[in-house]
Amino acid sequence: MPKRSEYRQGTPNWVDLQTTDQSAAKKFYTSLFGWGYDDNPVPGGGGVYSMATLNGEAVAAIAPMPPGAPEGMPPIWNTYIAVDDVDAVVDKVVPGGGQVMMPAFDIGDAGRMSFITDPTGAAVGLWQANRHIGATLVNETGTLIWNELLTDKPDLALAFYEAVVGLTHSSMEIAAGQNYRVLKAGDAEVGGCMEPPMPGVPNHWHVYFAVDDADATAAKAAAAGGQVIAEPADIPSVGRFAVLSDPQGAIFSVLKPAPQQ
């Protein structure tokens, strides 16, 4: 279902980048994914929110760092989860062990949002759609294809997401003593969860974009001033992926999906 007109509660439906150099970041992602941009003024004089588009569809956004951000705060790709009633979900966050970073507020007529952290410290946005449903094109080259919660306490985190947004999960062993949890909104598989692959990685929601060639995209990212954090590698039955960073230091992954059987 590449084109989307709605999202079930619990489904990651949007990603945006907060960066220290918005202009440079836009050029980098255009070189990688072919994105264009629609710039929308941020209320309160906070610059512009650059809506990334592909084939006329909204696929992501690139924004400046938020006002009052701590000095040295690294650029980051944020994940947002669709909710039916953001205020009702926010009311469950603190009792569930999380924290409310930004109380619910309206973004004009686009929607209503909040930003929270789960009990393991991973930050995530909550989005109640109005005019803006989130990404209207996914799972195609240059668009969002997967969102993955990396946390050192997966059981604690997943109990929280089940309580606040109704996400369930199934589990599979991917290596000796290492499980991968597939997140589900109803019967649909909408994301993943695993422990960080290396020491020192903070708990966070990680973003994957679809590409035609993971190796070529990694090389292109490096040539454009980014870095290859993890060299391209195969995931059996899933595809070939690489972990990259943009020139400002925001980390993301690219995935060439395996052919569908």
UniProtKB/Swiss-Prot annotation:
Q: Which PROSITE patterns match?
A: VOC
Q: Which domain of life is it from?
A: Bacteria
Q: Where is region (Glyoxalase 2) located?
A: 149-252
Q: Which GO terms describe its cellular component?
A: extracellular region; plasma membrane
- SUPFAM superfamilies in UniProt: Glyoxalase/Bleomycin resistance protein/Dihydroxybiphenyl dioxygenase (SSF54593)
Q: Which Pfam families match?
A: Glyoxalase (PF00903)
Quote the record's miscellaneous comment.
Answer: Overexpression confers resistance to pyrimidine-imidazoles (PIs) compounds.
**What is the protein's given name?**
Putative glyoxylase CFP32
Source organism of this protein record: Mycobacterium tuberculosis (strain ATCC 25618 / H37Rv)
Q: Which gene encodes it?
A: cfp32
